[in-house]
Amino acid sequence: DKGPAMKYRTDNTPEPISSHVSHYGSDSSQATQSPAIKGSAVNFNSHSMTPFGGPSGMTPFGGASSSFSAVPSPYPSTLTGGGTVFVALYDYEARTTDDLSFKGGERFQIINNTEGDWWEARSIATGKTGYIPSNYVAPADSIEAEEWYFGKMGRKDAERLLLNPGNQRGIFLVRESETTKGAYSLSIRDWDEVRGDNVKHYKIRKLDNGGYYITTRAQFESLQKLVKHSREHADGLCHKLTTVCPTVKPQTQGLAKDAWEIPRESLRLEVKLGQGCFGEVWMGTWNGTTKVAIKTLKLGTMMPEAFLQEAQIMKKLRHDKLVPLYAVVSEEPIYIVTEFMTKGSLLDFLKEGEGKFLKLPQLVDMAAQIADGMAYIERMNYIHRDLRAANILVGDNLVCKIADFGLARLIEDNEYTARQGAKFPIKWTAPEAALYGRFTIKSDVWSFGILLTELVTKGRVPYPGMVNREVLEQVERGYRMPCPQGCPESLHELMKLCWKKDPDERPTFEYIQSFLEDYFTAAEPSGY
């Protein structure tokens, strides 16, 4: 719902404030490339944001832990005592003896919600008490409890969900407006002959008397009544609302209450997924109940105390496009427990998985997701330090999440710390970081440019035919990789911006995200 405020036609039927063509249609002729980068003349001001946020107030090792605070509970703490009834939004299987299992729709009284992520609750149906994940419930009869309400979700993520294969025209969701506080957006999947599958977004405005409307002609006393009416009558919308957009259950925040430093015995390593210089990655089970990914580090890879300190910061970084850190085994050998991602690393996915068959629109969308996660890391004054396709994980429906953020600076191995050693990822590293150890969010931007080449070449090693030492020398002399085969020049221009010699001349991730999200913007008919 970016764009102008709602305009009305003379017949007062609502126009969507933005509509978007499917990224996955076979006919690419309908998509026009974003005008933001044309040839070498770059107009960064075509976006309202500044492209160059220098390393303002950034510590060399990412933000200090004081810049993070525990995520507050979204509901007032006066609930302690069980006055408000909460309803389950999803099914949940207990993972420990202290948890409650429940089904979607079950009602609870909250006994204690001061912990934030896990609340002590009593099931009204069974009378049993136990802990429940707070992001699985909402106050009964609230907007949050409606299955069609998706809360804080951006326009782009709404489009990704609605355009998933198998969804039909008229499928919809309601979310918070990104641009107008207190307003909502209705996002609907549509189809027409010119554009094929696309998504229309309508702003739902709030009246001073508490009512809601999309067009002033039809006003409703609640959001629920507006949605009910729109399911029966299109009333100027592109299509009447059919079914609610399917969604996946969110990840819980952590494995369970007080399950952060966990005993090694609680983990069962089942399927080895891969291995690198510093350890292995396994699919496994925690506590006999919960599927997880487990990264095992070789002895001596990093100091347990330093790791635990960094992990405390990492677990507070929460974003849809970051792999959540669930728990740790803090004695050597260190284990890191995270969400399990079904399709493995982006590198393997591109080389050997379904990624081999992806076309440019899907690859650009994956890049946009990674930029979204990195823009969050940028906002939090953190630094990744090892951004590359091997450290991105892929889930169902081409969802991408960033893994291993912040770990690289803790590695003690001499072959790595020398920065020219065999284990150091020179080909992904900005020259000022490789030569002088100057890691900033701007060196991450350089690495992102290299990751873009991995995406468009389906996992080819950067600088083909060159060894590490050669790469360092050539890049210092001004050499940059040429435009990969089949890659549009405008995307190569973005790569070259990421590889500017002066870190402050490289764009921000905020800019990169908006550039990639709008890369295939449909040409709108005049009058929109």
From Swiss-Prot:
Keywords in alphabetical order: ATP-binding, Kinase, Nucleotide-binding, Oncogene, Phosphoprotein, SH2 domain, SH3 domain, Transferase, Tyrosine-protein kinase
Active-site residues, as the UniProt record annotates them: D386
Record carries keyword Transmembrane: no
Stored SUPFAM superfamilies: Protein kinase-like (PK-like), SH2 domain, SH3-domain
Taxonomy, superkingdom: Viruses
Reaction catalyzed: L-tyrosyl-[protein] + ATP = O-phospho-L-tyrosyl-[protein] + ADP + H(+)
Sequence ranges of Basic and acidic residues compositional bias: 1-12
Bias kind Low complexity: ranges: 18-29
InterPro entries: Kinase-like_dom_sf, Non-receptor_tyrosine_kinases, Prot_kinase_dom, Protein_kinase_ATP_BS, Ser-Thr/Tyr_kinase_cat_dom, SH2, SH2_dom_sf, SH3-like_dom_sf
Domain SH3: 81-142
Entry EC number(s): 2.7.10.2
Region of interest: Disordered: 1-35
Example of a GO MF term: ATP binding
Keyword Kinase in annotation: yes
Domain Protein kinase: 267-520
Occurrences of domain SH2 (ranges): 148-245
Residues reported in the UniProt entry to bind ATP: L273, G274, Q275, G276, C277, F278, G279, E280, V281, K295
Modified residues (Phosphotyrosine): Y416
Miscellaneous note of the record: This protein is synthesized as a Gag-Yes polyprotein.
Family that this chain belongs to: Belongs to the protein kinase superfamily. Tyr protein kinase family. SRC subfamily.
Protein name: Tyrosine-protein kinase transforming protein Yes
Organism: Y73 avian sarcoma virus
Lineage summary: Viruses, Riboviria, Pararnavirae, Artverviricota, Revtraviricetes
